[in-house]
Design a protein with these regions (language model features):
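Helix-to-beta-strand junctions that scaffold the AdoMet/dcAdoMet cofactor pocket
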Residues: 274-276
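Adenosine-nucleotide cofactor-binding segment
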Residues: 190-199, 209-269
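N-terminal Rossmann-fold NAD(P) dinucleotide-binding loop
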Residues: 203-204
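Rossmann-fold NAD(P)-binding glycine/threonine-rich loop
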Residues: 284-301, 312-320
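Short glycine-centered segments of the SAM/dcSAM-binding site in methyltransferase folds
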Residues: 100, 193, 278-279, 303
């Protein structure tokens, strides 16, 4: 990986069509944004599909400002990007025009810190997010995938297996890697007992990955009507988490639990389900901090951890794994003109299980 040379110097640019929010209470609306002309190490991509992540909703509504991540407007969201390469820089070696390519949550990092050298660019202190992050090339902030095109350094561009449906592949760039990475890090393999808390955008991907890895998969949900879908996605068992009898049958038996719930809930009930040295991993982020009983961790040396997306090499590994096992997200494809309706439905958990925007609709305005 070449070291990034951060620069805010003026360079050639072009105008791209996009949808942006002008403020926290403003609907997303058509606009034009600047994109840099492809440089020596850059790949220009015509965006074909972009998934809608719940973090897009939080960011657009400035709901993370209290956590130190204020939104800069106009905000163009989108970090689940799949498209077709249109131009490449002279030093680009892994892509050519016409290739199908993808971009996830990161578009840059410093390239030489300990985290980058370990392939963990998501933890780089100077990493650049795909949107609402300082743009070291044009100034201002980065703009995401609710747009007709994007220009990204080659290192952060990914190959998409040819057998995957592109609309369904887009959410893999966030929901996919967010759930795949902790399973790989904590060695989810055949024979392990794995719990998935919550069957939403993240949870449904976690079920698919855990099943493909050969684990015995148990889904925890508050909704009995999700049982049939959980089994269809690959779960071996479904537990209604409000049913204390069902929960008590699993005490001390799990190797690994992935908690994908962002709503407030009692995490101690799930900690008790771990065996000795078992791991519960948080990928959901409730607004209020969890109240954790130390004794639940101490007496069986249980571990509570968090996980944030994944590095670039691991994200490519995840996409290749999806190609091998024919794994994609369950999506509802929408035109960009329905994005505000999709946001309202997402806030009411009214989607199975991700929205994917057909960006061809942007051209029909």
């Amino acid at each position: 990986m070449s070291t990034t040379q951060f620069s805010s110097e003026s360079r050639g640019q072009y105008k791209a069509e996009a949808y942006a929010a002008a403020g926290a209470k403003s609907p997303l609306a058509p606009t034009t944004i600047p994109r840099r002309d492809p440089g020596e190490y850059d790949v220009q991509i015509e965006i074909l599909f972009c998934g809608i992540c719940h973090s897009d909703l939080h960011q657009v509504r400035n709901e993370w400002s209290s956590g130190g991540v204020p939104t800069v407007y106009p905000c163009v969201p989108g970090h689940e990007i799949v498209g077709r390469v249109t131009k490449v820089g002279s030093a680009v070696t892994r892509f050519k025009p016409g290739d199908i390519a993808a971009v996830g949550c990161l578009v840059d990092s410093d390239g030489n810190c300990h985290e980058c050298q370990a392939g963990l660019e998501q933890f780089c202190p100077h990493m650049t997010l795909t949107y609402n992050s300082p743009d070291m090339h044009l100034g201002g902030v980065t703009y995401g995938g609710y747009s007709d095109s994007i220009v990204v350094k080659e290192h952060f561009v990914l190959h998409v297996p040819p057998n995957l449906n592109l609309a369904e592949a887009a959410p893999l760039l966030c929901a996919g890697i967010t759930t795949y990475s902790p399973m790989r890090h904590w060695s989810v393999t055949k024979g392990k007992k794995v719990g998935v808390v919550g069957l939403g955008g993240l949870g449904h991907m976690a079920v698919k990955f855990a099943h493909a890895l050969g684990a015995h998969v148990v889904v925890f949900t508050t909704s009995p009507n999700k049982k049939e879908d959980a089994l269809r996605l690959g779960a071996d068992e479904v537990v209604i988490s409000r049913n204390t009898d069902q929960m008590s049958k699993h005490v001390g038996s799990f190797d690994f639990i992935l908690d994908a719930v962002s709503a407030e809930h009692d995490i101690n009930a799930y900690i008790q389900l771990l065996r000795r040295d078992g791991n519960i991993i948080l990928v959901g982020a409730p607004e209020k901090p969890h109240a954790v009983s130390a004794l639940g961790l101490l007496f069986k040396r249980r571990n509570l951890s968090g996980s944030l997306i994944g590095g670039i090499a691991e994200t490519q590994e995840m996409l290749d794994f999806c190609g091998k096992h024919n794994i994609t997200a369950d999506v509802e494809v929408i035109p960009i003109q329905r994005v505000n309706e999709a946001y309202e439905r997402l806030s009411n958990a009214d989607v199975k299980y991700r929205f994917s925007i057909d960006m061809a609709s942007l051209k029909s305005q």
